[in-house]
Each structure stands twice: as C-alpha cells, then as structure tokens.
Amino acid sequence: MKILLITSIYLPHIGGIELYVKNLAANLIAKGHEVSVFVGDRFVKKISDSVEYGIKTIRVPVFYFKGMTYLRSKAGRKILEKELSSVEVVHLNDVKFLYKFLAQKKSIYGYKLFFSSHGFIFHTKSFLFLKKLYMKRMSKYSGFYDLNYCVSENDLKIAKDFKFSNLKMLIPGCDVKKFSVIDPNKFEKNVFVCFGRIAKNKGILELVKLFNSCSFDFFLKIIGKCDDDAYFQKISFIAKNDSRIEFLGYKTDEEIKDSIQAAEFLVFPSLHEGFGLTLVESLSSGKKIIANKIETFTQILTDCGLPEFLFDFSDDKNSLQVKIEELRKLPTRKINLEKYSVEYMSDVIERGYMGM
C-alpha cells in the first residue's frame, strides 16, 4: 500500500508524537509498504522534500496560532493534494491540523482515512471554551474517518464526550528495548534526569519550582528543546540561581542514554499527556522513576505493576524527599513491555488499513 502519514510536529523535536510517526513509518516500510511523512512545520520557511531517517519526508511552512496549525500557502496545499491523489491510505496525527480538510477531500481522492488522537487538544487548560467548541465542530467530520484511534482511556472518554464516531482504543507503540542496555544498578547518587519536549503541559516549570525549594543534595538535568521563549524564560528565572539545576538542551539518543545511565532517578512531571510514550521507553532501562500522578501515567504504571513510581507533584518538598527514600529501598527490576511495542501497534494499524 501507498501510505501518507501527516503530522504538525516531527523529529528532530523530542516527543511522543514525533517518535510515534517515525516508528510507525519505519515499521510499515519494513513490511513492504511505500510510506511518506507530510509535516506542517512552523519552523521552516521553505518547502522541502527529502529522505529523513530512511523515510520520504515533505515539510511545508504553516501558520501557527493559539495551538492551531494551518497551511500557509497555495503551494503547500497543492503539494498535499498531489500526495493525496496518489495514496491509498492517509493517517493524520493531530486533530488541530487538517482534520476537516482531509475528511472533505476523501470522496474526491478515494483514500482510506485514519486518525490518532495523541491527547487531542487538551494538553493545557488555556482557551478551554474555544477548544471545546473546536472539538464539537470536528466531531461532525469524525464519521468520514475509517477509524479514529484513541491512544489512552482518557482520550477515548474525551472522544465519546464529544460524540466522535468510529472509535478504537489503541495504545501507541514504542521502542520497548530502547534503553534496555542500561544497567539500572549503576548511577550517580542524587542525579535526577528529565528528558523530552519542554512545553507547558510537560510540567517543567512546576518541576523546577519544586526542586528549587528542596534543601537536600541533588543535581537535576533537564534535556530537551523549548519552542516557547516566554515559558522558558519563566523556568530559567527560577533555575538560573540554583547550580543544582542544569538545562542540557537537545541531545541525541546516544547522549540521552549516557544521561539516563548516570541518573539515579528519571523524572516525568507532565501535567497532561495523550499517552506517555517517553515514560514507557524509559521503563526499559529499569531505572527508578518519579512520575506525576496524572491519569495517563497512572494507567501505564498500574498496568505495569509499578504504582510506587507515581508521585503527586503538587505535594511539597518534604513529600518528595519521603518518596525518594521509599524508592531507594526498593530493588531495581526490568519488566516485559512487549504489549507496548511498535511492532504490535503497527501490526494492528496495518490490519486496520486493510479493513481487517
């Protein structure tokens, strides 16, 4: 099959959607399908068509406003429609980008149409009323999609609340062996590592505030890129006078592995997640984790038999210190994560594409 995956955020940015799209594309290619990735990229000024990570990738400039993403030019739309006219399957990965457009074009070009939720639009509570109006409007087009994949129980509930149709629950797959080479019993004491995309919903500001208030010895390393300058300035203002907190910026996978190996604890302070792919990948390291007690993380860690890794980041510094000491008393262990594997996920999606 000829397949087009569409996203508004992609590598080299670090995050769950980016990895989901790349992993899905790579696995479908390995199965013999012809796959391209179409990216509405607000950080590029020119249209590009190249091979990235072994995958044909088309990047077009977009206009980004209040979380919404729109194609900026007729040239970008023309290229998209050319791709739509030649594929059998289209798979969208952002409800804020082309959801209505792809539904309207389906009858013209005759492709099968799929969607993955990735938290929908509710990563923060800002503009909540407008977000609800938008979701209500988009739900009218959900019936044009052969399947709307919900990546978590929370997303499935949201979809049902807004009366989306053609729903299927499917946990995103990831590289469940990504950090398996790491020895969980080798670490530098009091080193905490947080990695991934830096954004408001990731809870980095709250993380820095909490650790900054702590009097015990620690070294917090934060890996990732922030595209919101105003938000990053708020974080930096608190952290700049605390030598225990260090921002390392963007790092390669190998560099991230080195940082994880050195860490005593991995920290996931997210306020909201569509799924939590980075958390699942990190479980393959066997390292002890401190993850915010949000619905998605609770679902994953409870399912994996690791509820002790949950912590309410709204608690105070004393509670954090208690949690750290509790975790230090527990043995390290690696668990079987095969049901979260990208191979399993891509098999299910491939069958969906085929109507099975």
PLM region spans:
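A conserved mid-protein helix/loop that constitutes part of the nucleotide-sugar donor-binding site
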Residues: 19, 190, 194-213, 230-233
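Short, structured helix-loop element that forms part of the nucleotide-activated donor/catalytic region
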Residues: 48, 157, 221-244, 255
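Membrane-proximal helix-turn-helix segments that form the acceptor-binding/catalytic region
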Residues: 131-148
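Carbohydrate-associated surface elements
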Residues: 154, 173
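Aromatic "clamp/platform" in nucleotide-sugar-dependent glycosyltransferases that forms part
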Residues: 271
